[in-house]
Regions:
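Cell-envelope/extracellular polymer assembly enzymes that use nucleotide-activated donors
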Residues: 62-65, 93, 270, 285
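Long helical/loop segments within the catalytic core of UDP-sugar-dependent glycosyltransferases
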Residues: 118-143, 148-160, 164, 168, ...
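Short aromatic/hydrophobic "clamp" motif used to bind/position activated sugar donors
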Residues: 171
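N-terminal membrane-anchoring/stem segments of glycan-assembly enzymes
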Residues: 1-60, 245, 417-420, 456, ...
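Membrane-embedded multi-pass helical conduit in multi-pass membrane proteins
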Residues: 36, 359-468
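N-terminal signal-anchor transmembrane helix
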Residues: 33-91, 107
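The conserved acidic donor/metal-binding loop of glycosyltransferases
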Residues: 99, 175-179, 278
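A conserved acidic beta->alpha catalytic loop
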Residues: 98-118
Length: 486
């Protein structure tokens, strides 16, 4: 076999590897889609009998402490807290933890909610880095807004201070830039009422608020963003939550509850020692550690996902900010999977150990590397094919069928799955009612796969490399425009 034959064999073998990987990852998403469809079908059948008003009026409904860690969030903090105080739930408090902001985050809250400094002793059940410097209570209504100011220690440390300060049975963690639908707590707390012994954590859907109409901290009209970057993130979020989280929850393998909206039993959080401060993705790491704790102690615990409650978040509209976000997210995933690698393929951890963890290693952690090298391969193959077609060369090193099959499996398959998420959204919730918004969403599902997806893979790959090199990383300064200002 001469050198050109060896090169041709190697190139075609690489092509078939990328095809096989693409088929496997997209077929696994197809399975998750079918599981999600089954879950939404069950949801549609039971939604009329949910009796959420009974939950609202039941005096024994567990109280919820809403924790909002804030760092330089003055652009939208007041609107976010206003939305929290307007939620329908019989017993809740809002705890804002200002993690040493450099802007006027605390001053905005103190003025807006007529707060007064009070000498509250925050327990130290969970060890924290930052020191509490002051605590404030609102003089309005039922005094259910508490502001805790502390020295900077990072998001996880701020949440741990919030857990210590929480006075309710359940703890709801939300991002400071998030808005919740009025009935969100009723929905996300329902699993705890239905199965109080086994349910230990519950997560809800997070959607992109950019472009929507915001009034008094509430999304009043859902619209697709006009800018291309946030509208692509809309379809990303729909696919991740309506297919990914719902499908994994259906089989008991939910590995991630978004830090933008998740509820946990406080007693379980204290048992776990709060959130880890030595990794970037503290919210996901907490859920993985919870699964590990359940398995190590032979407990019959559940981590569930509820598709109905909605938290709205502001997606980055600046490419540099989005790059930092995606690098941080993938670095967090890399650190988590490395830290808990002992769970992989261990029956003790059930579906999480046997299915979810291996899947995340193969199709989340490694996906950006395969995609980046796949793009390089495709570019080389197209150049060689073009040279042959123009008569510049007659090498025929790459089988043309390999190129077309790779394009079909990697692009068309992905578009179909994204469109499936849009169909699920329309049949189940119908948040986007206008034809214009639906058309924009469909276009965004196509737009995502041409340029954005490949650049995003490059960013994510960089996040893993940062984790493996041990590069120092902090919370970061994520500039926001503020919800309702798009």
């Amino acid at each position: 076999m001469d050198g050109l034959a060896v090169l041709s064999w190697g190139l075609n073998a690489c092509g078939w590897f990328f095809i096989a990987y693409s088929v496997l990852i997209n077929t696994s998403f197809l399975v998750l889609t079918l599981l999600a469809v089954a879950d939404f079908w069950a949801y549609l059948r039971r939604v009329d009998f949910a009796a959420y008003d009974e939950t609202f009026s039941e005096p024994l409904t567990p109280g919820i402490s809403i924790l909002m860690p804030a760092y330089n969030e003055s652009a939208g903090i007041v609107e976010s807290v206003q939305a929290m105080t307007a939620l329908r739930y019989p017993d809740f408090e809002v705890v804002v933890i200002d993690d040493g902001s450099k802007d006027d985050t605390s001053e905005q809250l103190i003025a807006a909610f007529d707060m007064v400094e009070v000498p509250i002793v925050v327990p130290t059940d969970i060890a924290t880095k930052g020191q509490v410097t002051a605590t404030y209570l609102s003089r309005r209504g039922a005094n259910n807004v508490l502001l805790v100011r502390k020295t900077n220690g990072g998001k996880a440390d701020a949440l741990n201070v919030g857990i210590n300060a929480a006075r309710k049975q359940l703890v709801c963690m939300v991002d400071a830039d998030s808005l919740l639908d009025p009935d969100a707590l009723l929905h996300v707390s329902r699993p705890f009422a239905d199965d109080p012994e086994r349910v230990m954590a519950s997560g809800g859907v997070v959607r992109v608020a950019n472009g929507s109409r915001i009034s008094r901290g509430r999304v009043t009209k859902v619209r697709m963003p006009n800018r291309w970057l946030p509208r692509i993130q809309v379809v990303e979020y729909l696919r991740a939550f309506l297919i990914g989280r719902t499908g994994w929850s259906r089989i008991g393998g939910l590995l991630i509850i978004s830090g933008a909206f998740g509820v946990f039993r406080k007693d379980v959080l204290l048992q776990l020692g709060g959130l880890a401060t030595d990794c970037i993705g503290e919210d996901a790491e907490l859920v993985v550690r919870l699964h590990r704790w359940i398995g190590d102690n032979d407990l019959d615990g559940r981590v569930v996902f509820v598709a109905e409650p909605v938290a709205w978040t502001e997606a980055p509209e600046d490419r540099a900010v989005l790059r930092k976000q995606r690098r941080r997210w993938h670095r967090g995933l890399t650190e988590i999977l490395s830290k808990h690698r002992g769970m992989v393929l261990r029956p003790r951890y059930g579906m999480v150990g046997m299915v979810s963890m291996p899947w995340f290693v193969a199709f989340e952690l490694m996906a950006p590397f395969v995609e980046v090298f796949g793009v390089v391969f495709l570019a080389v193959a197209l150049v060689l094919m073009g040279a042959d077609a123009l008569g510049l060369t007659h090498l025929e090193l790459v089988n043309q069928d390999v190129i077309w099959v790779l394009l079909a499996t990697s692009l068309l398959y992905a578009v179909v799955l994204t469109l499936a998420a849009l169909v699920i959204e329309e049949l189940s919730f119908r948040r986007y009612r206008g034809l214009r918004d639906l058309a924009i969403a469909v276009w965004a599902s196509l737009e995502e796969n041409i340029g954005y997806r490949q650049v995003n893979a490059w960013w994510r790959m960089g996040g893993s490399l940062e984790a493996w090199r041990g590069t120092k990383h902090d919370w970061g300064d994520m500039q926001r425009r503020g919800l309702g200002k798009t």
